[in-house]
């Protein structure tokens, strides 16, 4: 049996109360403790217990106490916009935000979502997502998160959370921990090794806690045999003690399984408070928790700690000062009495545009230069004829794909389809459009034969397991394009000498059949671009902006190359260990089709002048625990820089990427791991300098014996380049043992 945390055996119940650490939480805790003294026992229980499913205007609601000026909390999905409300902005999915590799856009997206949440009176927005991380390329909810790489995911978590909470809404980092597939998610045990847990799955949550995230959501699954929402190991010992998390842990909806065990194991809030349609007999807390405290099964100090954490988070983001009332109801169509969208469509378009990854561009097929005629082929080119919101929680694939399905969705205020946007540009250019807006290969070939260039739209969808779409129970059954996309492309390619393929997808698909067609000259990965889908695509394929997205995962030549997939069983032993995605491909010497971090531009970039300066010694991080972990773990201990020059004739943005290889003294470690990136916009001929700061954590591995982060001694390798495989500059530095 794998043991997740080797030093976590403890018989006594311990309350991991937050202690002063000089962070943003100190004043919030002081005020929360004052408010706690005014609450009755019943009011305390009401703050930690959801009212029930559909018991208030939001998907989650708490009881309002009378003794203090504190509301019924409104908790609402989703990670890409406000679910069950309108009008709101339907932003690009997390996976697209990650594909921008742009910290400013990540923050702007978070800030815009937070502003809309606050404007609607939402106190807690249920996002962003760090789990699933995406170890299984066909995992149903991978698209809600940012990347399969923990470093990129962690940076995205931090920037998004800061944006959301700066706007006044509490963010909720989810799903904690090991929620990597939809099949059996309510019963599966994710058995994760100690080191893999820390270096992969916990890593982005560390960044969330460091960013002062208000709340964390525990997941449906078990972790090493214990339900995540009643695991002392991951909630008390890891999240609250090791990571120093001052906020509160809430359950996913109906993920609680006990009264006492969940309380003493670190759960602070239960949602929705009852088992959906079966109240009140299914409630675990409420009066049952009050009785458990009365008979001593749950210490009074534990209940007080729950309440203090929840109140402190409310004070932390300033929700005690003129916060708007809830302006919608989730249960009557969500029509809000205010319009909170402002100019957020501009942000949505920028994220969608800058997340587009150009995978192939032979003979400079793109950008388009006022072609005489264009065939637009595929159902994915148009908005669902029944409307973009026709299917509940987007649980269908009947038009252009702009988000996956499930609770991680929002209502489209509008959806700009690719065909509509292209037609608008074509009219200005005098280009004739020949449409074939079905997935019928014969019709597609006929349209392609009548045009100078053909653009074929294909997609691949997934989502949450409570909805099955075309036989896919959340997780994808395979990595093929849906609706016989390969056959559609083959037919069009046989009829046209100049074919562009646009992919809207939740994750990687196998492209070998498409790449085997000689007339396929360009492939564009557009992901899940949200409401501005068509406009963002036109911005790129017509050259208004050079593509600058980079893959947030690896695209393989065949599905088996990933070495991981969702399993049809109730136990997942995470046998991949540290070796997922590019770490696996690198270690096994497998050539990907398109590697992690890959993405073409309309220009080229030259790297030069690598400079490395690292000033640290080997040893363990032993600093005082602050939000995120030991304080010295986040100390800057070195810099790496490189010059990047735009050698082309058009402006473009390049993402310079830093990878570090640990010395041989670090046991069984992937050859290289992402430890920095910087996106730079450069004019033709312009040179810029990318600078990466290295922290102790960036140079450390998790030592399972010491139960600490350790910087190993020896020679570290430095790789800087345009992707995980396109390395332009290499160097090294040596770290000696400390004295």
Swiss-Prot record:
The active site is at residue 252. Residues 1-17 form the signal peptide. It comes from the Eukaryota. Coiled coil: none annotated. One of its GO terms (cellular component) is extracellular region. The keyword Glycoprotein applies. Keywords: Carbohydrate metabolism, Cellulose degradation, Glycoprotein, Glycosidase, Hydrolase, Polysaccharide degradation, Secreted, Signal. The keyword Hydrolase applies. Transmembrane segments: none annotated. GO terms for biological process: cellulose catabolic process. GO terms for molecular function: beta-glucosidase activity. It catalyses: Hydrolysis of terminal, non-reducing beta-D-glucosyl residues with release of beta-D-glucose. Pfam families: Fn3-like, Glyco_hydro_3, Glyco_hydro_3_C. It is found in: Secreted. Pathway: Glycan metabolism; cellulose degradation. Its EC number is 3.2.1.21. SUPFAM superfamilies: (Trans)glycosidases (SSF51445), Beta-D-glucan exohydrolase, C-terminal domain (SSF52279). SMART domains: Fn3_like. Glycans are attached at residues 224, 398. Beta-glucosidases are one of a number of cellulolytic enzymes involved in the degradation of cellulosic biomass. Catalyzes the last step releasing glucose from the inhibitory cellobiose. Belongs to the glycosyl hydrolase 3 family. PANTHER family: BETA-GLUCOSIDASE (PTHR42715), BETA-GLUCOSIDASE L-RELATED (PTHR42715:SF28). This is Probable beta-glucosidase L. It comes from Neosartorya fischeri (strain ATCC 1020 / DSM 3700 / CBS 544.65 / FGSC A1164 / JCM 1740 / NRRL 181 / WB 181) (Aspergillus fischerianus). The lineage of its organism: Eukaryota, Fungi, Dikarya, Ascomycota, Pezizomycotina.
């Amino acid at each position: 049996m794998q043991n997740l945390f080797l030093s976590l055996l403890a018989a006594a119940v311990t309350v991991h109360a937050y202690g002063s650490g000089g962070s943003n939480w100190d004043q919030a805790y002081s005020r929360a403790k004052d408010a706690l003294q005014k609450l009755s026992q019943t009011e305390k229980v009401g703050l930690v217990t959801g009212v029930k499913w559909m018991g208030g205007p939001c998907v989650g609601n708490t009881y309002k106490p009378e003794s203090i000026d504190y509301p019924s909390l409104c908790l609402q999905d989703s990670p890409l916009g406000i679910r069950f409300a309108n009008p709101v902005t339907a932003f690009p999915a997390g996976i697209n935000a990650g594909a921008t590799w742009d910290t400013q856009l990540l923050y702007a997206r978070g800030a815009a979502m937070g502003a809309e949440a606050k404007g609607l009176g939402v106190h807690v927005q249920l996002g962003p997502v760090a789990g699933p991380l995406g170890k299984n390329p066909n995992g149903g909810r991978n698209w809600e998160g940012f990347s399969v790489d923990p470093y990129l995911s962690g940076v995205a978590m931090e920037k998004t959370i800061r944006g959301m909470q700066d706007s006044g809404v509490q963010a909720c980092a989810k799903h904690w921990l090991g929620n990597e597939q939809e099949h059996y998610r309510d019963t599966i045990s994710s058995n994760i090794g100690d080191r893999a847990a820390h270096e992969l799955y916990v890593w982005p949550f560390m960044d969330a806690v460091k960013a002062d995230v208000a709340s964390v959501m525990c997941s449906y699954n078990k972790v090493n045999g214990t339900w995540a929402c009643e695991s002392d190991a991951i909630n008390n010992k890891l999240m609250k003690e090791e990571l120093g998390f001052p906020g509160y842990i809430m359950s996913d909806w109906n993920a609680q399984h006990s009264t006492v065990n969940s309380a003493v194991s670190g759960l602070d809030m239960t949602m929705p408070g009852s088992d959906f349609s079966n109240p009140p007999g299914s409630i675990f807390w409420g009066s049952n928790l009050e009785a458990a405290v009365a008979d001593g099964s749950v210490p009074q100090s534990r209940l007080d700690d729950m309440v203090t954490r929840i109140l402190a988070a409310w004070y932390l983001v300033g929700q005690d000062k003129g916060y708007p009332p809830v302006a919608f109801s989730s249960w009557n169509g969500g029509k809000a009495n205010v319009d909170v969208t402002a100019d957020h469509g501009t942000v949505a378009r920028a994220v969608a545009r800058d997340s587009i990854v150009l995978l192939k561009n032979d003979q400079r097929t793109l950008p388009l230069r006022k072609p005489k005629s264009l065939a637009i082929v595929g159902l994915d080119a148009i908005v669902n004829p029944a409307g973009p919101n026709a299917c509940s929680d987007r649980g269908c694939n009947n038009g252009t794909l702009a988000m996956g399905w499930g609770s991680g969705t929002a209502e489209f205020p509008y959806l700009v389809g690719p065909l509509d946007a292209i037609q608008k540009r074509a009219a200005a250019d005098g280009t004739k459009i020949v449409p074939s807006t079905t997935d019928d290969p014969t019709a597609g070939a006929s349209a392609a034969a009548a045009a100078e260039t053909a653009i074929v739209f294909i997609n691949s969808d997934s989502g949450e397991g409570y909805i099955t779409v075309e036989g896919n129970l959340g997780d994808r059954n395979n990595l093929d394009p849906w609706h016989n996309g390969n056959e559609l492309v083959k037919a069009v390619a046989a009829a046209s000498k100049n074919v562009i393929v646009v992919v809207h997808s939740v994750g990687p698909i196998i492209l070998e059949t498409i790449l085997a067609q000689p007339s396929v000259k360009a492939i564009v990965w557009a992901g899940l671009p949200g409401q501005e889908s068509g406009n963002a695509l036109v911005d790129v394929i017509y050259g208004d902006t050079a593509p600058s997205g980079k893959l947030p995962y690896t695209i393989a030549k065949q599905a088996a190359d990933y070495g991981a997939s969702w399993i049809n069983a109730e136990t997942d032993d995470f046998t991949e260990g540290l070796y997922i995605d590019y770490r696996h491909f690198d270690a096994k010497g497998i050539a990907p089709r398109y590697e992690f971090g890959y993405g073409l531009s309309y220009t080229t970039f030259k790297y030069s002048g690598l400079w490395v300066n690292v000033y640290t010694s080997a040893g363990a991080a032993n600093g005082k625990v602050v939000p995120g972990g030991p304080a010295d773990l986040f100390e800057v201990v070195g810099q790496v820089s490189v010059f990047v020059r735009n050698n082309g004739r058009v402006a473009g943005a390049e993402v310079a990427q830093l990878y570090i290889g640990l010395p041989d003294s670090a046991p069984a470690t992937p050859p290289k791991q992402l430890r920095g990136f910087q996106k730079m916009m450069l004019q033709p001929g312009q040179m810029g300098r990318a600078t990466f700061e290295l922290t102790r954590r960036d140079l450390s591995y998790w030592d399972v014996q010491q139960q600490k982060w350790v910087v190993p001694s020896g020679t570290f390798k430095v790789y800087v380049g345009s992707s995980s495989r396109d390395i332009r500059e290499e160097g090294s530095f040596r770290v000696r043992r400390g004295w």
